[in-house]
Structure formats: structure tokens, C-alpha cells
């Protein structure tokens, strides 16, 4: 199967969730430009149309902040994107609480919950923790760590985060928040959408 990839100049992958109108085109190979670039399209009656503002797909339409919701600025190749990270922390009287993550690495979630417990004293041991990236996007970068932690704490304490706050940053095993690449680009994208505060 890889023989064909070596014969062509460009390899593109279409990605989408079942039932979604949106499609992501991901460049796996491009002899004439950058690889790993993303294009966002919407399927309409006239065919595919480019989504000019992809961040709008992944942001909530709510007017008020709710507990467990945080806006993350993630970097997909050369494109910064605003996505909503949601967490639900719910008491589980059983012996084995669940840890589920959609759009994020489940093992990373377990690690972040351990860091929260060790360095901030917030124990979620007797709780189920569910984390989701809204819109079906998969976020692989560690810059999502801080957003996951804040969303989980926000849900657990039933306190909403400010609506004009964006978050990004890697959380280390010793509890520190580490800087991530493309900080200026992330902040510029957030400012375009009216976000005034950041935690990074």
C-alpha cells in the first residue's frame, strides 16, 4: 500500500465523525509545501465549502460559563485553533472509578489527575472523571494538560472559569506549568475571538 504513496506528489486524508457535516483534510505528504497541514470544510448541498474560521466549529455557543468547561488554544500544524475542553467529575461510591477521555489520551488524563492529587491536594479518587474535546477533534499535544486540569477542578468544585479565559500549557510531574511552542500565535488567535485573559 505504501508503494502508491511514493509515486504521488501529495497524500491527503479526509477525516470526520459519523453524522458530522464537517470534514478535515490532513496532508500526510506534500512535495510542494508543508506536510501535516489541515484544511476544514463543510459539506453542503453545493458540495464542499471551506470553513474560514475553524475555531467557531469547536467553541460553545453558550452565553454564560458553566463548571467543567475551559477554552484551549491548541496548535494543529501551523494553525492555532480554539477548542472547548469539557470535564465531568461525578461521585462514584463503587471501588473502581472510571477515567474516560474523548479526543485526548486516556493515559495522560490519569497522569494529570495524579499530579493534581499530589501537588494541589485535590483528590478525585472516589469520582468518575470524563473529559471530552468538543467537536470531535483529537488533541495530541501536551499543551492541553492545563486545560484538562482546570476543567476537572472546575467541575469538581462546581465553579465556572471566566468566559474570556483561554488556557494552554504542559503540566510537569512536579506540578509546574511549562511553556509550549507557538505561544504568540496562540494568543493572537485567542485575541481575534475576543478572549482577554490567559492561563499558560
Label every PLM stretch briefly.
Residues 1-200:
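Peripheral, non-AAA+ core regions of ATP-driven protein-machinery
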